[in-house]
């Protein structure tokens, strides 16, 4: 469902943000 896709994209964005936060700098 489109709603499910939105959650998947949101999860990817958050996951990438966490990865950058802990592995960046």
Swiss-Prot record:
GO MF entries: metal ion binding; peptidase activity; toxin activity
Entry GO CC: extracellular region
Subcellular localization: Secreted
EC code: 3.4.21.-
Record text on cofactor binding: Binds 1 zinc ion per subunit.
Key words, A-Z: Calcium, Fibrinogenolytic toxin, Hemostasis impairing toxin, Hydrolase, Metal-binding, Protease, Secreted, Toxin, Zinc
GO biological process, one term: proteolysis
Signal peptide limits: none
UniProt enzyme class: hydrolase
Residues binding Ca(2+), per UniProt: 9
UniProt record similarity statement: Belongs to the venom metalloproteinase (M12B) family.
Self-association and partners: Monomer.
Protein role: Metalloprotease that is highly active against alpha-(FGA) and beta-chains (FGB) of fibrinogen molecules.
Name of the molecule in the record: Snake venom metalloproteinase catroxase
């Amino acid at each position: 469902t489109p709603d499910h896709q939105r959650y998947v994209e949101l999860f990817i964005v958050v996951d990438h943000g966490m990865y950058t936060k802990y592995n960046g700098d």
